[in-house]
Structure formats: structure tokens, C-alpha cells
């Protein structure tokens, strides 16, 4: 028994010195890195205020787009808040199709969910009021808490600068 173990260890040492082991690599083969910012162009691309500032300027020049207490110490539910935010953003983007002028700001104050948006006035005011009530009522039913939407209407998309 001991002789067979010695033979196996000698065999393994021969293979390990020859470099015959295979390993699994979990990194991407192309190794491309992309910065989280808008690329510089010819100066003909309009940018909003949120797009013009880089991500490291959050809390200095621009604010967070989602305000909640899920990331505080000993507070749970941060992952659930992110999923809720993604659902709310997609739902409102689909409901008010081609009317959003800028990103949504989602605030949670106690049990109330407040959604702030800047929209382009492409629809009649009566249709905006209907979609506003529809969105508030449906999201209140989904999340079992009061939902309030604060809208600001503009004539056209507000351009901060061109890049």
C-alpha cells in the first residue's frame, strides 16, 4: 500500500513539474474595460445634467437617483429596493412612453414612495392626469403603500451641454 502511494506521488510530481494541470479561468477573454461616462464626441450630442457629470461626482455636483435607508448599518432590504427601483423605472418609462426628459428620482420617506420626474409635454393634459392617477393607483396596489408622483412638464428636452 505504501509503495503504491509513493509511486502515485512520484507520478504526480512528474506531471506537476511538466505543467499538465488545467484550470478554469473566470475572467472575460477580451478583458475590455469601459468607463461609466459619456464618450467625448464632435460636440453634436446633447447631454442632460445627470449624463454630463461623471459617477464620482455623486453627492458633490449631483444627487442620488434613489433615496432610501437600505444601505445604513443594520438595515436590510437593499437588494429588494434596487429591484423595486428597476421595476418602477421600467413601468413609468413604458407608461409615459417618449415623454421622460430626464432620469426619475425615487424617494422613500417612511411608508410613502415619492417619484419625481421631468416630462416633455407631448400628450394632452387630460391624458397626463389619467396616466398619473393610473400609475399612482397601480403602484400603490403593487407595493401596498401610498405612492405619490411629482411631475414637472417642459416643452422640450432640457440640454445641459453638448459633447
UniProtKB/Swiss-Prot annotation:
It comes from the Eukaryota. GO terms for biological process: mitochondrial translation. PANTHER family: MITOCHONDRIAL 28S RIBOSOMAL PROTEIN S24, SMALL RIBOSOMAL SUBUNIT PROTEIN US3M. Component of the mitochondrial ribosome small subunit (28S) which comprises a 12S rRNA and about 30 distinct proteins. It holds the Pfam family MRP-S24. It comes from Danio rerio (Zebrafish). Residues 1-31 form a transit peptide. Its main location: mitochondrion. This is Small ribosomal subunit protein uS3m. GO terms for cellular component: mitochondrial small ribosomal subunit. The lineage of its organism: Eukaryota, Metazoa, Chordata, Craniata, Vertebrata. GO terms for molecular function: structural constituent of ribosome. It is found in: Mitochondrion. Keywords: Mitochondrion, Ribonucleoprotein, Ribosomal protein, Transit peptide. Belongs to the universal ribosomal protein uS3 family.
Amino acid at each position: 500500500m505504501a509503495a503504491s502511494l509513493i509511486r502515485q506521488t512520484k507520478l504526480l510530481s512528474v506531471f506537476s513539474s511538466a505543467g499538465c494541470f488545467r484550470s478554469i479561468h473566470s475572467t472575460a477573454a477580451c478583458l475590455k474595460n469601459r468607463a461609466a461616462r459619456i464618450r467625448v464626441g464632435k460636440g453634436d450630442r446633447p447631454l442632460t445634467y445627470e449624463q454630463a457629470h461623471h459617477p464620482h461626482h455623486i453627492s458633490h455636483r449631483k444627487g442620488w437617483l434613489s433615496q432610501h435607508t437600505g444601505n445604513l448599518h443594520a438595515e436590510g432590504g437593499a437588494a429588494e429596493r434596487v429591484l423595486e427601483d428597476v421595476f418602477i423605472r421600467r413601468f413609468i418609462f413604458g407608461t409615459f412612453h417618449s415623454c421622460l426628459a430626464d432620469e426619475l428620482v425615487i424617494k422613500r420617506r417612511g411608508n410613502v414612495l415619492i417619484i419625481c420626474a421631468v416630462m416633455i409635454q407631448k400628450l394632452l393634459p387630460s391624458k397626463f392626469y389619467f396616466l398619473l392617477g393610473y400609475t399612482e393607483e397601480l403602484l400603490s396596489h403593487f407595493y401596498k403603500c401610498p405612492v405619490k408622483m411629482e411631475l414637472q412638464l417642459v416643452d422640450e428636452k432640457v440640454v445641459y451641454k453638448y459633447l
